[in-house]
Regions:
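A membrane-topology feature that recognizes alpha-helical transmembrane segments
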Residues: 1-171
Length: 171
């Protein structure tokens, strides 16, 4: 990752976290220009190798979280945000960021469930999610589907921000 990627990524993560906490949305007006700028800056700084590095990072973030998103486990704004971050930081650092994001998200969801008094529901839902996929064709149970208004939804941009920022310091 080139040092020029640090500040734009921090700014976009801060805005995405704010909008996700406020409205449970990560807007396209934020993510899509950030993605295009990441590709452009990588090409400008490193030529063709920068293009491939940027596309690899975008694929790493978009595909891995895209699978979770398509299965109903997270919103597509989170997926697009990870793809855009990958365009700036490349595939190797994006993999580190995704692992750290998963760890941060796991800790956050446990704290959220304890504070909300639904830790038992969380474990039951996780079991339904993990062990029931074959029966449902890789869709979440109805009580966990993101399009169900009764489903508890945790904003995930804070976890993405924490994981990405920690990946900067892991180098």
């Amino acid at each position: 990752m080139h040092s020029v990627a640090w500040w734009p990524t921090v700014v976009v993560l801060a805005i995405a976290t704010f909008t996700d906490l406020r409205s449970r949305r990560i807007p396209n007006w934020l993510v899509l220009p950030f993605l295009v700028a990441g590709i452009a800056v990588s090409c400008w700084l490193h030529g063709w190798s920068g293009l491939w590095e940027s596309l690899g990072g975008m694929a790493m973030g978009g595909v891995l979280f895209g699978i979770i998103g398509l299965m109903g486990g997270m919103g597509m704004g989170d997926v697009k945000l990870c793809a855009a971050i990958g365009a700036w930081i490349g595939p190797t650092q994006m993999l580190v960021a995704l692992v750290l994001t998963g760890m941060a998200g796991g800790i956050m969801v446990l704290c959220w469930a304890v504070a909300g008094g639904f830790l038992g529901d969380l474990f039951k839902g996780t079991g339904d999610l993990v062990f029931g996929f074959r029966k449902r064709g890789f869709r979440p149970p109805e009580n966990l589907a993101l399009n169900n208004p009764l489903t508890r939804k945790m904003p995930y941009a804070p976890a993405i921000a924490i994981g990405t920022l920690f990946s900067f310091f892991s180098r």
